[in-house]
């Protein structure tokens, strides 16, 4: 799962396998797999990624919440590093909307609990208005109320036309959230089912298989 998402994001080179296609508003399809993050941006794809490793890949633990917002807004210029007002406003909005427990927006991220770190990361990535949003275990470490808050945010992204790739382990949640569910076992795709009609036992059978199937996710 980790390698799959990193390959789509352009963070890992792929040796072989089917391509992930992005269809633009004008109907043109482009391969994302095999391209660097810079090449993906040039295609007009605003890709946001909430990795499983929150502090290793997602946020910088020694930096405060505001500075972590600035990292996401940096597009190749220096303005983001000189102007803190917009990142500060975003940090405070995320703290308020996602009920992040922190002394202030200037608190180093490493001092937050795991659940609050996750809220900051998810909030930052969603705030960038992505066309493709990839999330790996976005509610791990969160309480029930916070989890449903994140699920609601993801559903709103879908309503806005964002393509959401959700990696999770709770079958009830996957069936509730996903339009299509791709099952993998030992690094191989074993099946793709309709999330609206899929049953847990059907998915369970696919989880025990180890055979490739053809199809696009």
Residue ranges and their predicted role:
Residues 1-217:
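Glycine-rich phosphate-binding loops of nucleotide-dependent enzymes
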């Amino acid at each position: 799962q980790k390698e799959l998402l990193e390959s789509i994001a352009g963070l890992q080179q792929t040796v072989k396998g089917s391509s992930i296609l992005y269809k633009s508003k004008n109907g043109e399809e482009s391969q994302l797999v095999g391209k660097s993050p810079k090449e993906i941006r040039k295609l007009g794809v605003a890709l946001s990624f909430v990795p499983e490793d929150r502090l290793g890949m997602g946020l910088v633990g020694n930096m405060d919440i505001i500075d972590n917002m600035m990292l996401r807004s940096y597009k190749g210029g220096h303005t983001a590093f000189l102007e803190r007002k917009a990142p500060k406003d975003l940090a405070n909005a995320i703290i308020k909307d996602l009920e992040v427990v922190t002394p202030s927006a200037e608190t180093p991220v490493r001092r937050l609990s795991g659940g609050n770190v996750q809220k900051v990361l998810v909030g930052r990535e969603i705030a960038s208005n992505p066309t493709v949003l990839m999330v790996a275990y976005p509610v791990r470490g969160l309480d029930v109320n916070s989890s449903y808050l994140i699920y609601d945010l993801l559903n709103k992204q879908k309503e806005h036309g964002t393509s959401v790739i959700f990696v999770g382990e709770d079958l009830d949640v996957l069936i509730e959230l996903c339009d299509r569910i791709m099952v993998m076992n030992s690094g191989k795709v074993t099946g793709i089912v309709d999330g609206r009609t899929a049953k847990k036992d059907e998915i369970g059978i696919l989880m025990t298989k180890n055979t490739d199937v053809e199809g696009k996710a």
